[in-house]
Amino acid sequence: MTEQKHEEYGADSIQVLEGLEAVPKRPGMYIGDTQDGSGLHHMVFEVLDNAIDEALAGHCDKITVTIHADHSVSVADNGRGMPTGIHPKEGRSAAEVIMTVLHAGGKFDNNSYKISGGLHGVGVSVVNALSDWVTLTIYRDGKEHFVRFVRGETEEPLKIVGDSDKKGTTVRFLAGTETFGNIEYSFDILAKRIRELSFLNNGVDIELTDERDGKHESFALSGGVAGFVQYMNRKKTPLHEKIFYAFGEKDGMSVECAMQWNDSYQESVQCFTNNIPQRDGGTHLTALRQVMTRTINSYIEANEVAKKAKVETAGDDMREGLTCVLSVKLPDPKFSSQTKDKLVSGEIGPVVNEVINQALTDFLEENPNEAKIITGKIVDAARARQAARKAREITRRKGLMDGLGLPGKLADCQEKDPALSELYLVEGNSAGGSAMQGRDRKFQAILPLKGKILNVEKARFEKMLASQEVATLITALGAGIGKEEFNPEKLRYHRIIIMTDADVDGAHIRTLLLTFFYRQMPDLVERGYIYIAQPPLYKAKYGKQERYLKDELEKDQWLLGLALEKAKIVSDGRTIEGAELADTAKQFLLAKTVIEQESRFVDELVLRAMLHASPIDLTSSENADKAVAELSGLLDEKEAALERIEGHEGHQFIKITRKLHGNVMVSYIEPKFLNSKAYQTLTQTAAALKGLVGEGAKLYKGENEYDADSFETALDILMSVAQKGMSIQRYKGLGEMNPEQLWETTMDPTVRRLLKVRIEDRIADEVFVTLMGDEVEPRRAFIENNALIAQNIDA
């Protein structure tokens, strides 16, 4: 780590450049996409980066990130605390200036922070501008300071609210619903970024807590970038055990790099500048690739490796199967945009070159076994590249890849403008025939795919080109294939729609196609050209009514609508009907879904009892005993036994023991379950049902009358009556639909539903490797961990 001098970090360190007015008008310039979730998570990362900068400066070793139940997020560190003194030019506290003025921060003069990732006042002020509210708590100079902001404006000046021996800053914010289409945070996306930061910053303990469901993870990962590479390769097969590692400093800049090759065919390189990831690389990555190629080629020539193998190696060959983490730290880094996806600082290139060249030369000379394995992998890649080039030449001579000859099975459209054209990739000739007859020939092209295409995750490039179905697909798309040939500007369709059956084979074919696009044509995914069709799962008839229903949920909702027609409940002289009946029924069905999902963790009988019980309180042994008594009273003692137990640090739990088919089943009600959205749904439902329907209640459906002593009984009767008059057909294959049905449900742009495929890079890479790679154990573990929560699986 670059040495940090402990200069004064006070109010006069803060420089002011401009205000916040522009941010809400153009949020994408500062935070990224506000609709797809990336900008929302970037809000957290901006605040988190400031805490990490305190760690880089040597003042912080503990950071806590919390997703609160109200969808706000807080980031707390034990650093120096934001300056609280009065800013000499602004006439108000420096903390308020940092939070309300764009480009106000302590990172412009290189004194308060020599190395920083974010500009503490660019990021955090943008977060303030795009939030409904922000609270800032500062522990500094023996005092606790507090200030609250509403939509970027100070509600009242910073004030001292008490004495404290703590140090640090806590920022809590609620993202603005006007700016962001959705403020649901993903625990996994935040955990991914925090894991990166933990590897990159040894000695910093970062904790992530989700109050919505009680999930918690602690990150105190060691090993630096080498440990990071080992983690990235955990689901792959490394070719050599020893990981290459390099570290060096020059002119106030540092370079740290780790590399390890595996048996896959994909390159996986993560680049960071002052802990900030660069998705699009930049000058540090360019320098790394150049020095790698030059250094390894020198070793190969000196040892006549390529000469003996009779091949010529290139830079791409050296990066096949490479997993690498490159982390650079430098003062005043320059990026191509505020989102910092690409580094443009030219001064880092020579430092990367010098550090990597010397370290890699030494590594290859001092570790002959590793060098032999790595160069052997490179030679194999060079042979495969040459074979692929020959395969391309053969296919080009046949007219396959230059657009002169289109596949015979492609039913092309009349439209020549790619932006107005769409290609349906359809499973099987039967469905392909229906799609051809049902389509709009003007702009819809159809390509039937026979059987399952090749799994490109396991296949070399030349083998992929030899696959007839893959070659047909490449030809139809018209954009070529491979780094030398692929040109997305030549793509013939800007909507590529995958349309497969709603069964296991259909899901497999869809996954194979997505693997192909992700690995071979990622540009098409990033540009938003790949879609998944959503054909209906059901066709339902009720009297003269006929409906296509997308999935199980839509079927249940339609059935509920039919069940509630001309229905009412009369209990204790009160009539429940119309909107009140519908809202309560929807709430109850939601609770049933929650019970079904949560029964993996908590006994189902007890979950059902919660719908008739008071909210559970486990804050003390007395309250826990009350909850045990109430729940036990709602259950038959032969069904389940409940008891209070005390856990670590006095935490209260309820243990549930139940005998089922001769087996003893044990589950627990834990404090974290009571903080979950699932339990909130159950308590809301219990409140809605309380006193609603009692003994002697009557249910009326049209002219019929039924006895119903509970709301659940009434709803069961209504759903049963509705189902009697309904006939449901489940579509397993697209071929079961005639052309007219396929058009009106799945292909008509005015009514169809399409899912646009978007990918979060690092998570996607891991999932594809797990599901489509060679290793059986990670795939088995993934299936076992997710089988119970998977939906729409056909037996």
From Swiss-Prot:
Catalyzed chemical reaction(s): ATP-dependent breakage, passage and rejoining of double-stranded DNA
CC annotations in GO: chromosome; cytoplasm
Cofactor binding mode and count: Binds two Mg(2+) per subunit. The magnesium ions form salt bridges with both the protein and the DNA. Can also accept other divalent metal cations, such as Mn(2+) or Ca(2+).
Domain Toprim: 421-536
EC number: 5.6.2.2
Note in the entry: Few gyrases are as efficient as E.coli at forming negative supercoils. Not all organisms have 2 type II topoisomerases; in organisms with a single type II topoisomerase this enzyme also has to decatenate newly replicated chromosomes.
Protein's name in the database: Antibiotic resistant DNA gyrase subunit B
Top-level taxonomy: Bacteria, Pseudomonadati, Pseudomonadota, Betaproteobacteria, Neisseriales
